[in-house]
A protein has these predicted regions:
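Short aromatic-glycine-(Arg/Gly/Cys) micro-motifs in beta-strand/loop hairpins
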Residues: 16-32, 106-122
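Intrinsic disorder/low-complexity detector
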Residues: 1-13, 19-21, 46-111, 141-146
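Mixed-charge, glycine-accented linear interaction segment located at domain edges/termini
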Residues: 32-36, 45-53, 114-146
């Protein structure tokens, strides 16, 4: 396993199911020790935000402000030690039943995310400049498969 992969910020998003309008699936990454299961897009974003905060990657440009610390709700699958994360082979072998794509969040500015989505079906890479744009891109793609 190369060090370049271990520090790879890509998240493999596997969309498995569309159930009563909600998208369900799993996330795999060398930055996780176990799959992250999500029940809809907002659940995915909130859980990933917690992991980004824990790992401080990508670094938020402003400190998070909170009045309540929820220690019990923190994700326990985020790998602080890159050697403890999932292997490249395991991550690359994962595919969703409906759709699969790799998402890279490069920065977290203006209380949002910036990065791109790489579709594994050969579609053109799509950049995003905020979480709402990302949600629209993902939703549009998955709905087009129905």
């Amino acid at each position: 396993m190369t060090e370049a992969y271990r520090t790879n910020p890509a998240l493999r998003i596997c969309v498995d199911r569309l159930h009563q309008g909600a998208i369900e699936g799993r996330v795999f990454s060398s930055r996780l020790t176990a799959p992250l299961v999500f029940t809809d897009w907002s659940n995915l974003v909130l859980r990933l935000e917690r992991i980004f905060d824990q790992q401080k990657l990508p670094q938020a440009f402003q400190g998070a402000r909170t009045f309540l610390y929820d220690v019990h709700g923190m994700e326990n699958i985020a790998s602080g030690d890159t050697a403890a994360g999932m292997s490249m082979e395991l991550v690359r072998a994962q595919y969703g039943q409906l759709s699969t794509f790799d998402m890279v969040v490069v920065t977290r500015r203006y209380s949002s995310w910036q990065g791109w989505v790489d579709w594994l079906d050969g579609s053109v890479r799509q950049p995003f400049t905020g979480v709402l744009e990302l949600l629209h891109i993902m939703e549009e793609k998955v709905r087009s498969l129905e």
